[in-house]
């Protein structure tokens, strides 16, 4: 009970002083997942100390005479260092989350386009202990505390922008062209996040879906900038490494209990599988459900377990925390990626499966439509339904997809029974992703936009 009380205490303190409740709790979950309660309390203390330091320095600025050297020894009126051509990529380079992958792959794209860049870990050394998970990331030497480039590209979501300014200080925003490279999973951009628009000069949207959502909320330029998808071919692991059977076609489905389960719709995926293959003794196919966040959301986990048939040996639940290499190996070892999502901002999981040449069965709605089509994917029909209040933040007035289970069942049967079709779809998928979402292709778009703004 003591640890729970401690957690509630630091959480309340964070919300009271740190701003942005949805962002705060997501950050708390991330810290606690890897560092436990003691790490969580330590992180809160560091943040609070940093905030007090910033507030103190701001107060001091109000009484410092012009030209007078302040306590740091720097003259506030001294000429500033010239800004270099290129961009500073700000985000969570060690984060084991989608936005962490976002900044890492952007670095690859900037490098491929030969655009000068640096990387800034917004929260200092947060996540540094996770560096070994990202052994394939070749730009760790680019991560520094300083970086004076003409452009800043923020690889975080809009709800983190104000908090990022508190951590980084206002100077890093000054005299730079600030770009928010944001994600969002619903069709209407939250009104509560519009203050973030005051901190940027333009927004880059990873998909047309996000582009439209944000463009409806601002007069700032909103530019569609696709995400890069590339990684070393995973090898050295087998199905046995994950305890998976070798004698059947395996569907793969991902979701995280800390990231709003209803959006990913695991119940729909399992229901479709059981309708497609109703005979429990039919060993031609199985479905692997890769889960994260069970320890942080035990009630949701138990409710999910009770909602499915755990006695069916064809439904395989994986709850082990995997490295990036292991995750991609798992995708490679399965036969089809299933995503009966209700909405996706982009859909990196789908894109990575396609990169590996896997047939993808996915809801034909939202961000994934930028790279999934009838020639390279199995797009499932849907109808729009209201998002209920408890299902996602800022749900009021929003709608998302309810995928057609019968249509998904038809595709699932086809990829199992028609090997040629599955292989053809998978090959078209790999060709598309490697052509249009390679670091060089995406980097060319980055360079083109920054050049148009005279920033490179």
For the regions a protein language model found, what residue spans apply to each?
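Extended catalytic core of nucleotide-activated donor transferases of GT-like folds
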Residues: 67-78, 88-90, 126-213, 326
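A short, well-ordered alpha-helix in the C-terminal region of glycosyltransferases
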Residues: 407-410, 414, 421-435
């Amino acid at each position: 009970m003591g640890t729970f009380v401690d957690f509630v205490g630091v959480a309340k303190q964070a919300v009271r002083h740190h701003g942005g409740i949805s962002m705060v709790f997501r950050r708390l979950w991330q810290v606690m997942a890897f560092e436990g309660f003691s790490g969580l309390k330590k992180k809160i203390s560091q943040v609070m100390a940093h905030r007090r330091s910033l507030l103190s320095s701001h107060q001091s600025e109000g009484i410092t005479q012009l030209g007078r050297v302040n306590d740091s020894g720097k003259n506030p009126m001294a000429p500033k260092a010239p800004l270099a051509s290129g961009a500073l990529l700000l985000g969570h380079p060690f984060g084991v989350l989608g936005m962490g992958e976002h900044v890492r792959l952007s670095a690859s794209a900037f490098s491929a386009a030969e655009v000068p860049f640096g990387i800034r870990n917004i929260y200092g050394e947060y996540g540094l202990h996770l560096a070994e998970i990202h052994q394939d990331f070749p730009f760790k030497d680019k991560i520094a505390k300083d970086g004076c480039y003409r452009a800043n590209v923020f690889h975080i979501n809009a709800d983190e922008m104000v908090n990022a300014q508190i951590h980084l200080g206002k100077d890093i925003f000054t005299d730079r062209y600030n770009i928010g490279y944001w994600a969002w999973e619903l069709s209407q951009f939250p009104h509560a996040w519009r203050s973030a628009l005051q901190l940027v000069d333009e927004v880059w949207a990873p998909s047309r879906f996000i582009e439209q959502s944000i463009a409806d909320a601002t007069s700032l330029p909103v530019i569609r900038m696709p995400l890069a998808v590339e990684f070393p071919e995973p090898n050295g692991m087998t199905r046995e490494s994950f305890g998976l059977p070798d004698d059947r076609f395996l569907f793969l489905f991902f979701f995280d209990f800390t990231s709003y389960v209803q959006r990913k719709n695991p119940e729909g995926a399992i229901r479709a599988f059981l309708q497609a293959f109703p005979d429990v003794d039919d060993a031609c196919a199985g479905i692997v459900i890769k889960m994260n966040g069970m320890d942080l959301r035990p009630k949701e986990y138990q409710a999910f377990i009770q909602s499915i048939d755990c006695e069916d040996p064809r439904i395989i639940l994986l709850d082990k925390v995997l490295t990036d290499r292991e995750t991609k190996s798992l995708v490679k070892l399965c036969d089809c990626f299933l995503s009966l999502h209700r909405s996706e901002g982009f859909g990196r999981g789908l894109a990575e499966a396609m990169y590996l040449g896997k047939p993808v069965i996915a809801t034909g709605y939202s961000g994934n439509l930028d790279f999934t089509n009838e020639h390279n994917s199995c797009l499932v029909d849907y109808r729009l339904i209201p998002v209920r209040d408890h299902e996602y933040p800022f749900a009021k007035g929003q709608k998302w997809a309810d995928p057609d289970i019968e249509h998904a069942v038809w595709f699932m049967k086809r990829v199992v029974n028609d090997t040629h079709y599955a292989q053809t779809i998978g090959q078209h998928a790999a060709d598309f992703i490697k052509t249009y979402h390679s670091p060089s292709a995406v980097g060319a778009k980055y360079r083109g936009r920054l050049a148009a703004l005279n920033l490179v």
